[in-house]
Amino acid sequence: MGEIFSEQSLNVQTVSDGVTASTTAQANGVSVGVTNADAAVTSNQDNQGVVYGHSVVDVAASAGASSAVRTTAVGNAAALSASNGTISAFAVQTNSAGVTARGQVEAATAEAADLTVSTLAMGNSAGVTLDNGSAGARISQSTTANVLADGGAIVGYVSGTSAVTATTAGNNINVTGANQSAVRAITDQANTADVTQASKFTAYGNSYMTATAATATGNNLAVSNDGPLADVAAHQWNTSYVRGQAEGTSYLFGAAQTTAYAAGNSARSTMSGPKSCSTTFRPIRAAASRRPPASAGTRAMTR
């Protein structure tokens, strides 16, 4: 597969309502949903091409009342859903090429009221959504290439709220059930990339409320179900160097928050209602044990 690029650049002088920029780069995607029916799914996704998504918004004077810049890059994506039905699935996702999402706002001499800059990068992502449904799934994910979400914002004056976030996962699985759903699943996640990184950098002249956050996870599994059964066996293997880096500065500010989070393996489950829940985790190696590569931590605010 060849390289996949999705880029856009907006040059704004002055706008009243706001600016919206959305950029998505994705190599492979599959979506299967059933309503009042049953389905059996077999999916094999293999990405070998670089995936790159980039958004740049330049503002000379004013970004207006509410602006949003969203950038997403994903190697392989799968979405499975059942409403009043049953879905059985066998899904394999393999990513062996770099995935990068970069979103930035350049407004050093401009003002903005409310601003949102969100950047998401994932090597493999799979989701199972149920509404009074049931699912039996075997999902295997493997990524061997670097995954990066990066960028930031430079703004002269923020009169409202500015939220700038970066989220990265080598492998990601979300299982969500509602209205008396039931699920049985076996998940395997292996991340052997050199680097899995989320980084955001912000600089403000004057600001009212700001939040800068970076979240990086080698392998992530989240299970949430409202129903009688959730039986999940999870196996996670990570040898990647995982880095979360967030930096924020403001000359004058009302309230400012900067958070950074990094984890080699993460597994969370939330259950409600009568249930039987069995979850087994097998983390083999955490990323923190590795030394950072020479290129890790470099800023990427330049184009």
UniProtKB/Swiss-Prot annotation:
Region (Disordered): 266-303
Gene Ontology, cellular component aspect: cell outer membrane
Membrane topology, record value: Peripheral membrane protein
Protein localization: Cell outer membrane
InterPro entries xref list: Holdfast_HfaD
Compositionally biased tracts (Polar residues): 266-281
The entry's keywords: Cell adhesion, Cell outer membrane, Membrane
Main localization of the protein described in the UniProt heading: membrane
Record has Membrane as a keyword: yes
An individual GO BP term: cell adhesion
Ranges of Low complexity composition bias in the record: 282-303
Function: Involved in attachment of the holdfast to the cell. The holdfast is a structure that allows the bacteria to firmly adhere to surfaces.
Protein name: Holdfast attachment protein D
Organism, as annotated: Caulobacter vibrioides (strain ATCC 19089 / CIP 103742 / CB 15)
Gene giving rise to this polypeptide: hfaD
